């Protein structure tokens, strides 16, 4: 056992607590020396300076030539212009008032019925952020019921429509797309809209857009007279959009306090602006990531919240951390292949699953435990074994069992889970991601890999159309013949397209064996 991981002095020396936030951060079970901290401390003057430039409105997403302003959303006074600050404040108040009007029934559907449900259509941060909000904070029988379409899986879409069948007339359809051109929400929106129209159900008067002004979605919502349009600023990225209208509207519609959510995030932002290293939680957390991974992401991040309501948090962090830090090049154009892989579920469930490997298997990770001190106000546990005490015991036991094998971990403790503390927790990780990116000299706010994937997908969709058009002309074609007519470099994608299009589909006659692609000959019937 590494005695350093169980040093009481180290624990006391590096434990961070803020009495305004009632959050603790313990990095003592990360292996490092005081000299390591001194070395990093010297770098943090430049880190804080870079973050300050970002907050002042510097162009931080170079690829898209835009500012990065999600920190302004929770403190409009620091935005680079009074116009931006006033717009943010107006948006927040508009969302709050709209939520009240929906919940108290002042805004109803065309049949004068109160709305009961929300079908949220968004992908990436536009889906994960709202899902985290509702899963973490929605209380029984409060606000509207939420369902999500965050993919173009045909089964998902059909199942959601089936689940909401009797309630579609009282369902708000919220479509989130900053540009309005993202294929997944657009396709899902068109399917849902068509379903409503084909079944004599309202779409336009039940539909809400969250998008940029003058985007394709904005113009569509205007022309079709949708119920509402909420602003999504150009300088807000998807993975950091949770304190924008993307996260605030769900809060308002589940009858939670959006101002407390913003206040928690704002106070955490403020706590991370101090130049006092040991009193800066984002400096401590990002340094722990840096030290345990040798500054090159050698270890995966395993997120273990010991509360079911935070189960989605690990998925949320997957996008926030991996999309921000997974970069091939640093700012000097050098190949660095940076990144931290993130996975997790919840405790104590994971103690009966992969924690076995964490303790006894390959040592390629660090854990982030998240614990809460509160418990529900109820008498159902009186005279019974207290589940809260057991849950705490399981967390401490797992933490101890890991450290006994020199496995590293971080522990974050919240007094309770509410709008305020969730806002603060999210802000802590957002700031830590920014700090880490500065430490390793990468841009946290571009996503060239995502854009490359989108372009490749667009190419495949183009090939799908070309294959379909070719088969419509009639005649038999082998894969080699099809590729020679379309693009000789894409034989494998053509095989995948044909399998998706033709396997089990009686509209096509297929000769040959699917296990031998070169033997396949395909013809469209009746063509």
UniProtKB/Swiss-Prot annotation:
GO cellular component terms, semicolon-separated: cytosol
Disulfide links within the chain: none
GO terms of molecular function: carbohydrate derivative binding; glucose-6-phosphate isomerase activity; monosaccharide binding
Pfam families linked to this entry: PGI (PF00342)
Enzyme class of the recorded protein, top EC level: isomerase
Classification via PANTHER family: GLUCOSE-6-PHOSPHATE ISOMERASE (PTHR11469:SF1)
Full protein name: Glucose-6-phosphate isomerase
Organism annotation: Prochlorococcus marinus (strain MIT 9312)
Gene coding for it: pgi
């Amino acid at each position: 056992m590494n005695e350093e991981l169980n040093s009481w002095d180290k624990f006391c020396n590096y434990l961070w607590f803020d009495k305004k936030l009632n959050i603790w951060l313990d990095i003592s079970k990360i292996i490092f020396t005081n000299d390591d901290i001194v070395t990093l401390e010297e770098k943090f003057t430049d880190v804080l300076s870079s973050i300050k430039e970002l907050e002042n409105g510097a162009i931080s997403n170079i690829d898209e030539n835009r500012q990065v302003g999600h920190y302004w959303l929770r403190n409009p006074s620091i935005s680079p212009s009074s116009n931006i600050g006033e717009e943010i404040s107006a948006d927040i108040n508009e969302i709050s008032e709209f939520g009240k009007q929906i919940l108290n029934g002042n805004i109803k559907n065309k049949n004068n019925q109160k709305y009961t449900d929300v079908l949220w259509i968004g992908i990436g941060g536009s889906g994960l952020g709202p899902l985290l909000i509702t899963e973490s904070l929605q209380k029984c029988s409060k606000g509207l019921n939420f369902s999500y379409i965050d993919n173009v899986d045909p089964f998902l879409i059909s199942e959601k429509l089936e689940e909401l069948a009797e309630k579609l007339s009282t369902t708000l359809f919220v479509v989130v797309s900053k540009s309005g051109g993202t294929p997944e929400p657009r396709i899902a929106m068109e399917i849902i809209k068509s379903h409503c129209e084909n079944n004599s159900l309202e779409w336009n008067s039940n539909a809400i857009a969250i998008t940029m002004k003058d985007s394709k979605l904005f113009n569509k919502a205007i022309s079709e007279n949708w119920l509402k349009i909420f602003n999504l600023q150009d300088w807000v990225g998807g993975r950091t959009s949770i304190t924008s209208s993307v996260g605030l509207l769900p809060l308002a519609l589940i009858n939670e306090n959006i101002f407390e959510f913003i206040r928690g995030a704002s106070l955490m932002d403020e706590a991370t602006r101090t130049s006092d290293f040991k009193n800066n939680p984002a400096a401590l957390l990002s340094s722990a990531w840096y030290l345990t991974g040798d500054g090159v992401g050698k270890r995966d991040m395993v997120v273990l919240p010991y509360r079911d309501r935070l189960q989605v948090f690990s998925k949320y962090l997957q996008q926030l951390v991996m999309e921000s830090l997974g970069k091939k090049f640093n700012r000097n154009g050098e190949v660095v292949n940076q990144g931290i892989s993130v996975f997790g579920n919840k405790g104590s469930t994971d103690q009966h699953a992969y924690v076995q490997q964490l303790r006894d298997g390959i040592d390629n990770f660090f854990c982030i435990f998240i614990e809460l001190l509160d418990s529900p106000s109820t008498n159902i546990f009186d005279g019974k074994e207290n589940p809260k005490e057991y849950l705490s015991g399981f967390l401490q036991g797992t933490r101890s069992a890991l450290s006994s094998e020199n496995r590293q971990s971080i522990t974050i403790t919240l007094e309770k889970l509410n709008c305020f503390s969730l806002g603060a927790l999210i802000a802590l990780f957002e700031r830590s991601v920014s700090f880490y990116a500065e430490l390793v000299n990468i841009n946290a706010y571009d996503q060239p890999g995502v854009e490359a994937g989108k372009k490749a997908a667009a190419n495949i969709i183009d090939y799908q159309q070309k294959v379909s058009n070719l088969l419509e002309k009639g005649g038999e074609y082998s894969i080699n013949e099809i590729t020679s007519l379309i693009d000789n470099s894409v034989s494998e994608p053509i095989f995948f397209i044909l399998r998706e299009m033709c396997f089990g589909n009686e509209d096509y006659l297929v000769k040959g064996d699917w296990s031998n692609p070169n033997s396949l000959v395909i013809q469209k019937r009746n063509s």
